[in-house]
UniProtKB/Swiss-Prot annotation:
Pfam families: Bac_DNA_binding. Belongs to the bacterial histone-like protein family. PROSITE patterns: HISTONE_LIKE. It comes from the Bacteria. It comes from Rhodobacter capsulatus. This is Integration host factor subunit alpha.
């Protein structure tokens, strides 16, 4: 497994090389796309990117949890969590890479 992490800079550099926009325009494009995705998720909307996956926000109810050190029961408050569900194509690509 690779230790490499894909960053915003990597994405904007790829747009610069492959699309032909200037470096500034490429960085601005990446930032704009990420901002639109973030804004939609904050509003509770689902972000679906075909052949990639779906980002969604789920509401979790309050429940009782347990402190692993003491075993004491502690209440866990309700919260919103972000989840990602990869598309079947993405799952297949990752599995194919693992098979090599």
């Amino acid at each position: 497994m690779s230790e490499k992490t894909l960053t915003r800079m990597d994405l904007s550099e790829a747009v610069f090389r492959e699309v032909g926009l200037s470096r500034n325009e490429s960085a601005q494009l990446v930032e704009t796309v990420l901002q639109h995705m973030s804004d939609a998720l904050v509003r509770g909307e689902t972000v679906k990117i075909s052949s990639f996956g779906t980002f969604s926000v789920r509401d979790k109810t309050s429940r009782m949890g347990r402190n692993p050190k003491t075993g004491e029961e502690v209440p866990i408050s309700p919260r919103r969590v972000l989840s990602f569900r990869p598309s079947h194509l993405m799952k297949d690509r990752v599995a194919e890479r693992n098979a090599k």
